[in-house]
Curated annotation (Swiss-Prot):
Signal peptide: none annotated. This is Methyl-accepting chemotaxis protein 2. PANTHER family: METHYL-ACCEPTING CHEMOTAXIS PROTEIN 3 (PTHR43531:SF11), PROTEIN ICFG (PTHR43531). Residues 244-480 form the Methyl-accepting transducer domain. It comes from Thermotoga maritima (strain ATCC 43589 / DSM 3109 / JCM 10099 / NBRC 100826 / MSB8). Keywords: Cell membrane, Chemotaxis, Membrane, Methylation, Transducer, Transmembrane, Transmembrane helix. Chemotactic-signal transducers respond to changes in the concentration of attractants and repellents in the environment, transduce a signal from the outside to the inside of the cell, and facilitate sensory adaptation through the variation of the level of methylation. PROSITE patterns: CHEMOTAXIS_TRANSDUC_2 (PS50111). The lineage of its organism: Bacteria, Thermotogati, Thermotogota, Thermotogae, Thermotogales.
Length: 530
């Protein structure tokens, strides 16, 4: 059986035991519950019977005293009979009660005492029956509790002990099977593959694991033997390849040295030719640069002359605009002065309005006082006087606002006047400087025109010299090309040799790496005991 099946078996047995205990306890509780329900029903019937007996006793007494009808007594007795069918102790007395009630109906009142004694006897029997039922119920509950307690304290421990023993046996066997695996793991950690594991004959997971582990160790041992054999063979081949590669490298080094000597001599010849060519090219280049510079200088001189003339025209326009700005600034000063005068006049008007408002306020106050003295006749005049006083106060407040605004405008006008004066001064100064600059630009234009004529003469002479230098440079360039072709051919051969040498060195490096890896592999394989 597999480990999973064994574990499932233990769980099933334990669960079955628990279910058995639960079913047993449930049946006991079910039986006890039925008894309790039956006792409770009997108790309810007894209580109902006692109530009916009490009511019957009361109705009989009322009937004897002509306070109740015979139908009520009969109806109540019939209800009591229905209850008595379910209570044996009450049913025994129903015939006697029925005879006594019949006699009372026929007019025999002395029977009432017998009915009362019968009812009391029935009540005593019912109460005695209830006591017996309660005692039986207590015994039933005690028995059920004792039975369940015995089951819980006897059956469950037995099941738990049995399950524990079974699990202990199963785990012990599993650990015994795993012991060779642990020993083999320690041997593998010590690089020892000579360990021999006995084959397990079980069919559970632990036995399967042990057999798979045994097969893995044997597979690893066989592979390591093959690796050892192949490693020694590869090491011998690497040594032979390394020796052959060293011989090729030495031959390539000798050829490379001879090619370096040839290349050095050709490079020396080429360098001399190149120096001569470079000198003539430098002369030609310098001559061309001088000619170009002279032509550029002449062109710049023409441009400078044109720009100077344009600058003179622009400067004249600036002078005219500056003078116009100066005139406008003076006009602004006049406007600002007129504005300040108008502000002073507005201030005077505001003060006059303010004085009138104060006088109006005083007159309105006096009118209000006189209206108050006049009583009812002056009430309307007092209202008008109060409105006039408010209007005077609003006028006074508005005049104050106007004065404040006028003061702000006057301050701004003063600032504008100062700025305008400063602009006028700066414009006059700029006009003087512009006049001086105009005179100097005229002088510069004349000087640049003279320089332009001299540069044109220099450019013509340099062009003739440049043509002669170009002829010398052409001849030297052809010699330099021939030397370069020879040098390039030698360099190409040398480059090919260098590539071959580099490839050989790379092969040597890789062979050395392989040699080191093989040596490391030999050391690793040698650690294992096979």
């Amino acid at each position: 059986m597999s480990l999973k099946g064994k574990t499932l078996l233990v769980s099933t047995i334990t669960l079955a035991a628990v279910v058995l205990v639960a079913l047993l306890g449930g049946s006991v509780f079910l039986k006890a519950g039925q008894n309790v329900r039956k006792a409770f029903e009997e108790y309810e019937l007894a209580v109902e019977a006692l109530d009916k007996l009490g009511e019957l006793e009361t109705k009989v007494a009322l009937f004897v005293n002509n306070a109740a009808k015979i139908e009520e007594v009969s109806s109540l007795f019939n209800e009591l009979k229905k209850v008595a069918d379910k209570i044996p102790s009450l049913k025994e007395h129903m015939d006697a009660l029925e005879r006594n009630i019949s006699e009372i109906i026929s007019g025999k009142t002395e029977v009432v005492s017998r009915i009362q004694s019968s009812v009391d006897q029935v009540k005593e029997d019912i109460m005695a029956n209830l006591d017996r039922t309660r005692e039986n119920l207590d015994k039933e509950i005690s028995y059920s509790s004792e039975l369940i307690r015995n089951v819980l304290f006897i059956v469950l421990p037995i099941v738990a002990v049995a399950s524990g023993v079974f699990l202990f046996v199963m785990i012990s066997r599993s650990l015994r099977l795993l012991k060779p695996v642990m020993e083999a793991s320690r041997s593998l950690r010590n690089n020892d593959l000579t360990i021999n594991i006995q084959e397990a004959k079980g069919k559970d997971e632990i036995s399967t694991l042990l057999n798979e582990f045994k097969a893995s160790i044997e597979y690893l041992r066989n592979n390591l033997k093959d690796v050892q054999t192949e490693t020694f063979s590869v090491a011998e081949s690497i040594e032979e390849i390394s020796k052959a590669n060293e011989e090729i490298t030495n031959q390539l080094l000798g050829i490379s040295k001879e090619m370096d000597n040839i290349s050095t001599r050709i490079e020396s010849i080429s360098a001399s030719v190149q120096e001569t060519t470079a000198g003539s090219e430098e002369i030609s280049s310098a001559t061309k640069n001088i000619a170009d510079s002279a032509q550029q200088a002449a062109s710049f001189a023409d441009q400078s002359t044109q720009l100077a003339k344009e600058a003179g025209d622009a400067l004249k326009k600036v002078i005219e605009v500056t003078r116009m700005i100066s005139n406008s600034a003076k006009d602004v000063e006049r406007v600002v002065e007129s504005f300040q005068k108008g502000a002073e006049e507005i201030t005077s008007f505001v003060e006059t309005i303010n004085a009138i408002a104060e006088q109006t306020n005083l007159l309105a106050l006096n009118a209000a006082i006189e209206a108050a003295r006049a009583g009812e006749a002056g009430r309307g005049f007092a209202v008008v006087a109060d409105e006039i006083r408010k209007l005077a106060e609003e006028s006074q407040q508005a005049s104050e606002n106007v004065r404040r605004v006028v003061n702000e405008i006057r301050s701004i006008a003063e600032d504008a006047g100062k700025v305008s004066s400063e602009i006028t001064a700066r414009v006059e100064e700029g006009t003087k400087l512009a006049d001086e600059a105009d005179e100097k630009l005229n002088s510069i234009v004349g000087a640049v025109e003279r320089i332009n004529e001299m540069l044109q003469n220099i450019a013509a002479a340099i062009e003739e010299q440049t043509a002669a230098v170009d002829e010398i440079t052409t001849a030297m360039t052809e010699n330099a090309k021939n030397a370069e072709e020879i040098t390039n051919s030698v360099k190409e051969v040398n480059a090919r040799l260098q590539e071959i040498s580099a490839s050989t060195e790379e092969v040597t490096s890789r062979v050395q790496t392989i040699r080191e890896n093989v040596q490391m592999l030999k050391e690793i394989v040698a650690r294992y005991k096979i």
